[in-house]
């Protein structure tokens, strides 16, 4: 614990908040190119094959991002837009791919929560 004299000389330094999405560099979304599209398994106690993509961003950072929704058309060299937001049961996955933007198609036959999956209004 510092003495009063030390506090007068130096003062307390406010703690800096560390970003949860450093690769975004304070941007809401960022564009990138898929370098690898694959499936991975979640942590215990969940079980599934989660679709993820390794993306090289325009700031030349490589990140792993989750592809939400049922079915996707992404492959290597697809251009995608990513947003922040981690997937709790996939360690190291801190970003989401935006559906219905650039090379990513929206989810087919989606009736509810369409805006989150880039699906147009059904006729």
Swiss-Prot record:
The protein's UniProt keywords, in alphabetical order, are: Methylation, Ribonucleoprotein, Ribosomal protein, RNA-binding, rRNA-binding, tRNA-binding
* UniProt GO molecular function: rRNA binding; structural constituent of ribosome; tRNA binding
List of residues that carry 3-methylthioaspartic acid: 89
Q: Which InterPro entries match?
A: NA-bd_OB-fold, Ribosomal_uS12, Ribosomal_uS12_bac
Database matches in PROSITE patterns = RIBOSOMAL_S12
The family annotation for this protein states: Belongs to the universal ribosomal protein uS12 family.
According to the record's subunit comment, the protein's assembly and interactions are: Part of the 30S ribosomal subunit. Contacts proteins S8 and S17. May interact with IF1 in the 30S initiation complex.
Q: What is this protein called?
A: Small ribosomal subunit protein uS12
Organism classification, top ranks? Bacteria, Pseudomonadati, Pseudomonadota, Alphaproteobacteria, Sphingomonadales
């Amino acid at each position: 614990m510092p003495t009063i004299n030390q506090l007068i000389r130096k003062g307390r330094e406010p703690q800096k908040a560390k970003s949860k999405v450093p690769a975004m560099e304070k941007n809401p979304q960022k564009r990138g190119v898929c370098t690898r599209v694959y499936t991975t398994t979640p942590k215990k106690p969940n079980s599934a094959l989660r679709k993820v993509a390794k993306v090289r961003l325009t700031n030349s950072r490589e990140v792993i991002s989750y592809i939400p929704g049922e079915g996707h058309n992404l492959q290597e060299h697809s251009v995608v837009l990513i947003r922040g937001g981690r997937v709790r049961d996939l360690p190291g996955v801190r970003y989401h791919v935006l559906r219905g933007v650039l090379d990513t198609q929206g989810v087919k036959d989606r009736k509810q929560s369409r805006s989150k999956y880039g699906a147009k209004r059904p006729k």
